Amino acid sequence: MPLTVDRRPAPALRVVQTRVASADASIDLGDLDGLYRRYSPYVAAVATRLLGRDSEVDDLVQDVFLNALAGISRLRDPQAVKGWLAKVTVRLAVRRLRKRRLLQTFQLSSEIDYQQLAAADTSPEQKALLVKVYRALDLMPARTRVIWLLRNLLGEPLHAIVELTACSQSTVQRKLRDAEDHLTRELDHA
């Protein structure tokens, strides 16, 4: 069964992106509280999709803005803050996924309830598929998982994924193929 994916960003993320884009006109990099209020919904939306676990999102958002506090002075263009925060979110999500996988290897992590990610009006069949996909994603290397989610769940174009992950375009394309192959195998056997 070939895996087909709607490459448009998820509706909730599109709403957040629209709000953030309209607010980008005046950005004060010295106002971290204002940056947090403006961009934390966007960072949380990206983190939720990458991690697949709501319980870790708040911690990741805080970590992203702690990194922002330390690194915001190096940002030259205030209009680039959203992309920079996305890049920090991706980097920290990859670290967190690697740590989670290590803990699962030694059975030090609890089972994840992926059904909580589904919208209230999601059918039982769709919830079951969501659980299967995220469980298959759990078996992937963290960076491969994140690249696949950026492309297929968040709808990011290749050039944006290259920028967000600091990988070459050929590496991103290879990891996308690897992820598709892995998901096809796992979902066919599930």
List each language-model region with its residue ranges.
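A short, charge-rich alpha-helical start-of-domain segment used by transcription regulators
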Residues: 21-45, 55, 69, 133-135, ...
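Internal acidic/polar
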Residues: 10-19, 103-126, 130
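Arg/Lys-rich amphipathic alpha helix in sigma70-family domain 2
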Residues: 73-76, 87-108, 126
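Short, Lys/Arg-enriched C-terminal cap helix and immediately downstream tail that follows
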Residues: 98, 140, 178-190
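Short helix-capping/turn signature of helix-turn-helix
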Residues: 13, 38-40, 50, 149-157, ...
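Sigma70-family region 2
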Residues: 24-25, 65-81, 99-101
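Structural recognition of an alpha-helix C-terminal capping motif at a helix-to-coil junction
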Residues: 59-66, 79-91
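Helix-turn-helix DNA-binding module
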Residues: 138, 142-146, 154-174, 181-182
